[in-house]
């Protein structure tokens, strides 16, 4: 059966019953229908063991390696072995849902439901973020039209408009055409909503007051004498914040096995920081003994950003890290073509295992215990599975087979037991770089220690920006690397575990509201495009309202 067909066969429990499982009363949630709710703020606090499990992965194939599916299956498995558990996930963007992925709520018997609602409009968070982003853009252009009291240089506005769909035609636009009453003409562009700074701010804010402070710190552009202009200067921070007041609150849903799940926030890990909201993670820690969360793409992207950006905001490091690997991805890294990944090839798998080894070492560098989850696919052979287990054993790390797509939590009880054992071990977390290190030092540490590269080259523009940041006092902020997810390098075709490569930083984007500086590398884009055959072509809805084609 297809994912959506499996999900449609399960009758969800009332969201009030799911809330009760999590220790929440009806007065502590606002219901969005019978199967969704938002938590009220401030978050409730129970006495729990506060074990935090981070799920990350190796560099993926274009289809993804099932990290969300493993996260959900692991959460169900922990519940099955008697542990108080909460799952925290990012919410899907319509861009990949309609584009390449077709959905982002897990798969098979490890899904969060109602999957149709979550994949589409859910509780409206994405639309609120899009509206807030574009309201700010409109207010900026209106300020310029109405006399430009702040002296904003329209050539140096860095705030773009946003849309929650992949639309390459909107990457570069010209606005303000049509005469004097239609605004001041200038170049503009669109980012996908999940790349908006407001998404990062939403995911890192602790409460409304923190949200408003962060919104006010946003740098929207520069004056003619190159001084930064902020939202506070425009005096619109309150208006933007009130548009996000409900989006700030975590969303409560359930898995197919009725484990409570918080699905909130959705920044991509290749062009943003790739973690669900701090409030959702904190809610899980406050309500359950074990909170399972994921970070986008591989340990080089979401994993690194979780450790260096999210951990300080959450206030707790992971007690254990699960690295998801698949036989097919390891063979891809070993040189096998995409169309041949279903054919047994132990030699190629062993060659590609270096990518897994690199991610293991990258996560161990933070001082936290690691286990590998082999996400099982039907084409995997015993010889290939044993080869991965042997490789990991040589590194002193357990590799546990998990069939979460086919069996749900039942297929991950061994993984759950391994995670419980890891959480009982001491964790000695340490960040990759000192907090007071400058941007170049932090970038060099990420490139050499996490990616395995040798050098960093900066474009002339990036070098000018670094000098500006130093003058503004921004040169000690955390850095958020925007990089391809397919390779440890900035070249998506350079697979495996390359060494000696150079990362090319072409431009920086200061995101003071989020509290970090984005470094754009290679050819990474903040507005993706749709593939030749977008998933939307296979979607439909029947006359009686039954949805098909989501997965």
Curated annotation (Swiss-Prot):
It catalyses: (6S)-5,6,7,8-tetrahydrofolate + formate + ATP = (6R)-10-formyltetrahydrofolate + ADP + phosphate. SUPFAM superfamilies: P-loop containing nucleoside triphosphate hydrolases. Keywords: ATP-binding, Ligase, Nucleotide-binding, One-carbon metabolism. Transmembrane segments: none annotated. Its EC number is 6.3.4.3. One of its GO terms (biological process) is tetrahydrofolate interconversion. InterPro entries: Formate_THF_ligase (IPR000559), Formate_THF_ligase_CS (IPR020628), P-loop_NTPase (IPR027417). Pfam families: FTHFS. The keyword Cell membrane does not apply. The keyword DNA repair does not apply. One of its GO terms (molecular function) is formate-tetrahydrofolate ligase activity. It comes from the Bacteria. Pathway: One-carbon metabolism; tetrahydrofolate interconversion. NCBIfam families: PRK13505.1. Belongs to the formate--tetrahydrofolate ligase family. HAMAP family: FTHFS. This is Formate--tetrahydrofolate ligase.
């Amino acid at each position: 059966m297809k994912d959506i067909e499996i999900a449609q066969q399960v009758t969800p429990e009332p969201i009030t019953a799911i809330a009760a499982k999590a220790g929440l009363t009806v007065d502590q949630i606002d219901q969005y229908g019978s199967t969704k709710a938002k938590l009220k703020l401030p978050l409730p606090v129970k006495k729990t063991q506060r074990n935090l499990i981070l799920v990350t992965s190796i560099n993926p194939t274009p289809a993804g390696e099932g990290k969300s599916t493993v996260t959900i299956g692991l959460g169900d498995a922990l519940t099955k072995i008697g542990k108080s558990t909460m799952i925290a996930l990012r919410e899907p963007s319509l861009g990949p849902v309609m584009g390449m992925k077709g959905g982002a709520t897990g798969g098979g018997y490890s899904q969060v439901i109602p999957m149709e609602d979550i994949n589409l409009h859910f509780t409206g968070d994405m639309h609120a973020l899009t509206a807030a982003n574009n309201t700010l853009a409109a207010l900026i252009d209106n300020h310029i039209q109405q006399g430009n009291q702040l002296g904003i240089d329209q050539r140096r506005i860095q705030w773009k408009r946003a849309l929650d769909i992949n639309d390459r035609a909107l990457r570069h636009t010209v606005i303000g055409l049509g005469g004097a009453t239609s605004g001041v003409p200038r170049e503009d562009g669109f980012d996908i909503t999940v790349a908006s700074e407001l998404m990062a701010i939403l995911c890192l804010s602790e409460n409304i007051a923190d949200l408003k402070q962060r919104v006010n710190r946003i740098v929207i552009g520069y004056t003619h004498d190159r001084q930064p202009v902020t939202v506070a200067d425009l005096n619109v921070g309150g208006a933007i914040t009130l548009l996000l007041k409900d989006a700030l609150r975590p969303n409560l849903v359930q898995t197919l096995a009725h484990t409570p799940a918080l699905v909130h926030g959705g920044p991509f890990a290749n062009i943003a920081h790739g973690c669900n909201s701090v409030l959702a993670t904190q809610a899980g820690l406050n309500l359950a003994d074990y909170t399972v969360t994921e970070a986008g793409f591989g340990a080089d992207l979401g994993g690194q950003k979780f450790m260096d950006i999210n951990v300080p905001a959450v206030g707790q490091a992971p007690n254990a890290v699960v690295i998801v690997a698949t036989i097919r991805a390891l063979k891809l890294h070993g040189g096998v073509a995409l169309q041949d990944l279903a054919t047994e090839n132990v030699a190629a798998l062993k060659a590609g295992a270096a990518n897994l080894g690199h991610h293991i070492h990258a996560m161990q560098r933070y001082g936290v215990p690691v286990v590998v989850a082999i996400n099982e696919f039907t084409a995997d052979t015993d010889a290939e599975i044993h080869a991965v287990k042997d490789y990991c054993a040589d590194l002193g790390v357990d590799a546990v087979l998990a069939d979460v797509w086919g069996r749900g939590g039942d297929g991950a009880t061994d993984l759950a037991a391994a995670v419980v054992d890891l959480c009982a071990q001491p964790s000695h977390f340490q960040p990759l770089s000192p907090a007071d290190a400058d941007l170049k030092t932090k970038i060099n540490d990420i490139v050499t220690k996490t990616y395995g590269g040798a050098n960093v080259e900066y474009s002339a523009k990036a070098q000018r920006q670094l000098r500006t940041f130093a003058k503004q006092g921004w040169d000690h902020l955390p850095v958020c690397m925007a990089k391809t997810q397919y390779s440890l390098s900035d070249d998506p075709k350079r697979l495996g575990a390359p060494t000696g490569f150079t990362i090319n930083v072409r431009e920086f984007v200061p995101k003071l509201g989020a509290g970090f500086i984005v470094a754009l590398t290679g050819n990474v884009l903040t507005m993706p495009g749709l593939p030749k055959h977008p998933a939307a072509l296979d979607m439909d809805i029947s006359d009686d309202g039954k949805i098909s084609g989501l997965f």
